[in-house]
Amino acid sequence: MATSPDMLCSFCPAPFKEFFETVTNMKFDEEPNYAKLISLFDGLIESPASRPIRIDEALKVGQKRGRSQVNHEEDGQHKKKVRLGSPASQWISVYNARRPMKQRYHYNVADNRLQQHIEKGNEDGLYISCVASSANLWALIMDAGTGFGSQLYEISTVFLHKDWIMDQWEKSFYITAIAGASNGGSLVVMSKGTPYTQQSYKVSESFPFKWINKKWKEGFHVTSMATAGNRWGVVMSRNAGYSEQVVELDFLYPSEGIHRRWEHGYRITSSAATSDQAAFILSKPKRKPVDETQETLRTSAFPSNHVKDKWAKNLYIASICYGRTVS
């Protein structure tokens, strides 16, 4: 964190500082000791007999920032957390070092304008590499480095249209990019020429961490993610080219976690965010890239000017999403 506990809690009683330090220093999947945290404030309030507040249920809670697993629906999903205040949403763009290539972006694209942009890109030898959505409009990244042979897409009023996806699977197309809109709709891109041999996807009211864990054990890795409102869509594929994969999920942009993963050879390969949470999939590729440089950028508006600066350094958009970054 940029602001120290001393500064934030300088005018607060000592227990507040200790509480703050404990919580902010917890690990991603560490379960809080609620009894200990609550006991910090015993000296500041009246005895339990004079305060009619039940804390026994709080002691049973097993979550920190929605990270541990609880029983919810059939999948043991994270329960949604409600926080006060006005969260800020931004564009989160991820850039990878690549050999010089042609890349093109479009943003604030309405449904009826999407086809002309895609057709023009295809004519120029470009295929869609990633998509995103903000305010029910689409952002589209197309480039010459996908390796795809052909590509299909569908805009649907439902989030990840199952029948259409299954029809394309039958034709040996695989999902290569997805985006969800706040109105519940989605844009799904499926391609030929991928290394994938099998795919599975899940739509969930909360981040499907338990399902991801299950699929990891079956040899799948996350290859695409998106959100529609507060719903999550995650696509996992076999033969994705990764040896290991981890998740960073937080109410804020997890800068420290991402940098720590970078130091251990991971790179961001998927990202998605709701108005409440941001999730990043970081993977270790089986084949180490020649240049492992990766940068991220957070901007209030679509980063059109920044993209051109990145291109000048041979850094190209690899992932982009719009959602929660700061409280």
Each language-model region and where it sits:
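C-terminal lobe of the eukaryotic/viral protein kinase catalytic domain
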Residues: 1-27
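Terminal C-lobe "cap" of eukaryotic-type protein kinase domains
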Residues: 20-52, 65
